[in-house]
């Protein structure tokens, strides 16, 4: 016997689960119900009344978002009483609305516009003065015009429930009610920009985007974010060659429909500080040149150089580019290459460096240990998923590292490897919590891996996972959280030291000793130029940032929004980014640069098109061809390399400043404004204003 409930909506019979609301049942039947306050990812408020429907035998229309279905319920959404009720609700909503659509940034994609047209009337009977509300200061990202607010409270519920930073709320009652930040302070959440998408009117809009474009002027491209290793699905809106804004796309398995502030607002950095032509250092000054001259200088250096050549890949580079550079290095006979520019000690089979549980799999876990990571800053969207699971209850969380506000209750049980060793030995109480859990998981961050004893920390974490039952036939709770969008793809294609090759630290030592005379920095901007000694530096990247400043030759490349390329997120999901705009000037796609350079060096690569490159790459890593899939990676194994003795030092935060983690972010005026606002908040309460 089925326990599902039979409901009839406008003559359409549907079966739904008990507890389903009338609104959800209507959606199951394919009937659209207007709404302002209701959102499927937020709690039910039931305060806009736009979703009124008629239920048979009920004395008056009911709010469909808040009313659960009953057996054999008959719902009518198109009766005269329903239409009249919706017209009345819309008239009340518009009583105090300023009707300033021509100067509102929400115009053209506004729920209030659409529903007023579909369900409202063409005139108002209100003749008194409208209410006016002072604007609220919410920082450099969110612009407010609170006179437009209809008090749906979506922003309040998002800040409290999803972001976990209850900094938006309502004060006053009735007509005097106002949405505010209480203290007129800048929003602190790394997810605050999502209130812009949630706002059904023009009360909360994007401050950097204000008065720049209308939605119908923009060319929209669905692609992938590269600001962190989550791989959030995004939409890039472009006018001409200029990126105008970035919005989230729905992907239940990755980012649901949320987006971090850095991913959303970094777009202005794509339009500034760009490298648009090759440069060559002459008499200690960088001078613009052409591609053949730049290639000639590189060829001459490699022929004359007494040492070896090495390559380092940065955080924002794509998988195809790393495979092309790796292939070129093989042609040149050099095993010295590394995609771990932070020096993280990761190696071995694929399961050793993936978030094996999967981002969506967090919701199936029942205990969590964080080791050397602050997911709130390193992966804000993933952190929201952890908070979602925590809100569901029965989810103990412990952390080893620097105490901080993670937006959920976590017990900070220690600061460094010593605590991890105690857990492995069973001397700490949380070891029992993990052992008793059915699906425990741990998240190992780069703050624990990018240290001299990173391999030892990894081995201890793996031992803990094995001892507490985190790894079984149907569950893998051992997870590595990356911070770089290009890291997993680089490791998948083997952009790692070959036999006898040097890793990142070894390359730096080789430069100092003179054993390595030439270094290719492929988007590697976090390497200190002084550490490279007298080595000849070739920089391939999109922005005039740290890597370019110290380079001897600069080759301009495309940014992540300017090429079709594969990025592999921290859970090992290969996703294809699409080109939303063209690179500026003479800049070229990464793989094309390496292909042309190989010709000039007499080490021609065997592919002439990106499809041919991918064919060869897929032979090496077949899972990369399975886009948008989580391919099983097996079981993590103890590193083959010698495990160093554990250092007693505490795990340090891997991000020193959340808003300045890469060249695009450092070129963004919006990110600079965010960093300044954060410093101002910290100064007001006696902090430092950095994340370290």
Feature annotation, model-predicted:
Residues 44-49:
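A short, glycine/Asx- and small/polar-enriched loop/turn
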Residues 2-19, 24-27, 35, 39, ...:
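N-terminal export/assembly segments and adjacent metallocofactor-ligating motifs
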Residues 16-20, 254, 451, 455, ...:
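Short, conserved micro-motifs enriched in small and acidic residues
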Residues 51-53, 539:
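Glycine-rich beta-alpha loop elements in corrinoid/cobalamin-binding modules
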Residues 58-60, 471:
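A cross-taxa feature marking solvent-exposed loop/turn segments within ectodomains of secreted
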Residues 341-630, 681, 685-692:
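Non-catalytic alpha/beta scaffold blocks inside enzyme catalytic domains
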Residues 611-692:
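Long, low-complexity segments enriched in small/aliphatic residues
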């Amino acid at each position: 016997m089925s326990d599902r409930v039979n409901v009839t909506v406008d003559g359409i019979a549907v079966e739904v689960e008990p507890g389903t609301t009338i609104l959800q049942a209507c959606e199951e039947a394919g009937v659209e119900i207007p709404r302002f306050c209701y959102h499927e990812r937020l709690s039910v408020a039931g305060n806009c009344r736009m979703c009124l429907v008629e239920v048979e035998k009920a004395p008056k229309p009911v709010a469909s978002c808040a009313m659960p279905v009953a057996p054999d319920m008959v719902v009518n959404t198109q009766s005269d009483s329903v239409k009249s009720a919706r017209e009345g609700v819309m008239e009340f909503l518009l009583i105090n609305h300023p009707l300033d659509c021509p100067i509102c940034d929400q115009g053209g994609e506004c729920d209030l516009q659409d529903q007023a047209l579909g369900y409202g009337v063409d005139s108002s009977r209100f003749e008194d003065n409208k209410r006016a509300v002072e604007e609220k200061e919410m920082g450099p990202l969110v612009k407010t015009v609170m006179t437009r607010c209809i008090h749906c409270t979506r922003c309040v519920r998002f800040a409290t429930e999803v972001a976990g930073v209850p900094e938006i709320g309502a004060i006053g009652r009735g007509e005097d009610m106002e949405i505010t930040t209480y203290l007129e302070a800048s929003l602190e959440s790394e997810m605050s920009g999502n209130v812009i998408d949630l706002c059904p009117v023009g009360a909360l809009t994007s401050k950097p985007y204000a008065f720049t474009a209308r939605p119908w002027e923009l060319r929209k491209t669905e692609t992938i974010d590269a600001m962190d290793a989550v791989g959030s699905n995004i939409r890039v809106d472009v006018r001409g060659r200029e990126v105008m804004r970035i919005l989230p796309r729905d992907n239940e398995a990755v980012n649901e429909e949320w987006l971090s502030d850095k991913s959303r607002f970094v777009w202005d950095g794509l339009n500034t500080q760009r490298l648009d032509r090759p440069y060559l250092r002459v008499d200690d000054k960088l001078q613009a040149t052409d591609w053949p001259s730049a290639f000639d200088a590189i060829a001459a250096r490699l022929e004359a150089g007494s040492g070896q050549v090495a390559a380092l890949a940065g955080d924002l580079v794509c998988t195809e580019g790393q495979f092309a550079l790796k292939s070129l290095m093989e042609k040149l006979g050099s095993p010295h290459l590394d995609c771990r520019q932070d020096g993280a000690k990761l190696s071995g089979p694929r399961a050793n460096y993936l978030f094996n549980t999967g981002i969506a799999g967090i919701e199936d876990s029942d205990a969590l240990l964080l080791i050397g990571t602050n997911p709130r800053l390193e992966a804000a969207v993933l952190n929201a998923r952890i908070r979602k699971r925590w809100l569901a209850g029965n989810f103990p969380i412990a952390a080893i590292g620097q105490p901080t506000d993670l937006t959920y209750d976590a017990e900070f049980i220690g600061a460094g490897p010593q605590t991890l060793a105690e857990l492995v030995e069973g001397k700490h109480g949380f070891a029992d919590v993990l052992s008793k859990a059915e699906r425990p998981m741990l998240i190992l961050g780069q703050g624990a891996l990018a240290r001299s004893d990173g391999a030892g920390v990894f081995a201890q974490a793996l031992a803990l996972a094995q001892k507490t039952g985190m790894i079984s036939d149907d569950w893998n709770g051992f997870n590595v959280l990356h911070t770089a969008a290009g890291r997993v793809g680089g490791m998948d294609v083997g952009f790692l030291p070959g036999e006898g090759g040097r890793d990142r630290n070894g390359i730096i030592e080789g430069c100092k000793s003179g054993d390595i005379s030439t270094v290719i920095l492929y988007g590697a901007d976090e390497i200190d130029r002084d550490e490279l000694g007298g080595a000849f530096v070739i920089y391939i990247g999109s922005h005039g940032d740290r890597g370019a400043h110290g380079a001897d030759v600069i080759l301009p490349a495309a940014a992540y929004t300017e090429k079709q390329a594969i990025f592999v997120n921290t859970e090992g999901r290969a996703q294809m980014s699409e080109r939303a705009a063209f690179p500026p000037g003479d800049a070229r796609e990464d793989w094309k640069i390496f292909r042309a350079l190989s010709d000039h060096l007499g080490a021609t690569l065997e592919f002439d098109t990106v499809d041919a490159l991918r064919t060869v790459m897929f032979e090496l890593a077949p899972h990369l061809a399975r886009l948008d899939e989580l391919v099983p990676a097996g079981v993590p194994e103890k590193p083959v390399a010698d495990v160093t003795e554990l250092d007693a030092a505490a795990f340090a935060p891997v991000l020193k400043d959340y808003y300045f983690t890469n060249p695009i972010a450092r070129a963004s005026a919006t990110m600079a404004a965010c960093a300044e606002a954060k410093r101002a908040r910290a100064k007001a309460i006696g902090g430092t204003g950095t994340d370290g």
